[in-house]
């Protein structure tokens, strides 16, 4: 029943998104982007309340912790998506269409990764320690790397697509595929969609281990993942500016990853409750936001 409720909510949001709000190809304004993202955030928070009343406070805390971590870890994804759109010269009026269909892929591929990860961890518990090492290493690396980059032309995926598929040199309106001389040709819109899906899988390799350190409940992990990503896609059109403004969030995220990594190593000796993980996550993110605001004000003045 819980899965039916979740997928009903997601289906309704997707129909509202593309079928009503963005039925025509138009560029989303900054204000619309913020309002739509806030709408998704409220829905995600309400789903946490659903957890609270149906499965208890502990599950609700785990859900909110997973949601915040996934939200923070997905920020770099925005920069890579922006690079892809710039490379293929995708106009703003078509970007939302690509992001929308990208969500469909995310819903499918994240389900496979999370379900597969749960099976592996239940069978090989020691995998969590490998995840812990990855998280600590990623956290330390985050201190020294500004943003993740993506060399499109030299990527294996791009080379494979160009080599094996018929590609149109230019966009064909909002179409992903066109037919010419009884042959299918794929447009730059399609290639950008495939690359965005591939990049999401790469970023998921970083974020999903962090979530498994909080809980091994598939429903909590999956729902928090999807709601976090839905909100970020809605905020894409203004997020680059916001992330630049909150430049210290990456350091908060680095500390969160290191904290989660150590939490895995010590869980046999000290059990850290879900509410502590939630408090640590919120506190570190708030420190990052406040420090960024103070820094921005000092630079402006």
Swiss-Prot record:
One of its GO terms (cellular component) is plasma membrane. Signal peptide: none annotated. The chain crosses the membrane at residues 1-21, 33-53, 72-92, 101-121, 124-144, 185-205, 220-240, 246-266, 270-290. Keywords: Cell membrane, Membrane, Transmembrane, Transmembrane helix. It is found in: Cell membrane. InterPro entries: Integral_membrane_TerC (IPR005496), Integral_membrane_TerC_rswitch (IPR022369). It is a multi-pass membrane protein. Its main location: membrane. Belongs to the TerC family. PANTHER family: MEMBRANE BOUND PREDICTED REDOX MODULATOR, THYLAKOID MEMBRANE PROTEIN TERC, CHLOROPLASTIC. This is Uncharacterized membrane protein RF_1252. The lineage of its organism: Bacteria, Pseudomonadati, Pseudomonadota, Alphaproteobacteria, Rickettsiales.
